[in-house]
Amino acid sequence: MEIAVEREEENYLELRIQGEDHTLGNLIAGRLRSVKGVILATYYLPHPLKDELVIKIKTDGTISPREALNRAIEDVKVLGESFLDELEQV
């Protein structure tokens, strides 16, 4: 996985991630939408034959896009740990 910042402003961040597809894009964008202060969280695949995605994050200014991304990633980590705990009990 390679990550490049395509565009960054005070309330906007656009990342290009090589080697990933809808799986990561949908997971991260979905979690970003639940972070307070995020007003836009989306992703797209620039080309269907390339493993590459672009994530766009826009905030209302109460949180930076990078902080929102960090919170979303932490949420995903907690979700994964919770899933593994539940799976062990089955």
Swiss-Prot record:
GO terms for biological process: DNA-templated transcription. The gene is rpo11. GO terms for molecular function: DNA binding; DNA-directed RNA polymerase activity; protein dimerization activity. HAMAP family: RNApol_arch_Rpo11. It comes from the Archaea. This is DNA-directed RNA polymerase subunit Rpo11. The keyword Cytoplasm applies. It comes from Metallosphaera sedula (strain ATCC 51363 / DSM 5348 / JCM 9185 / NBRC 15509 / TH2). Transmembrane segments: none annotated. It is an enzyme of class 2 (transferase). DNA-dependent RNA polymerase (RNAP) catalyzes the transcription of DNA into RNA using the four ribonucleoside triphosphates as substrates. It catalyses: RNA(n) + a ribonucleoside 5'-triphosphate = RNA(n+1) + diphosphate. Part of the RNA polymerase complex. Its EC number is 2.7.7.6.
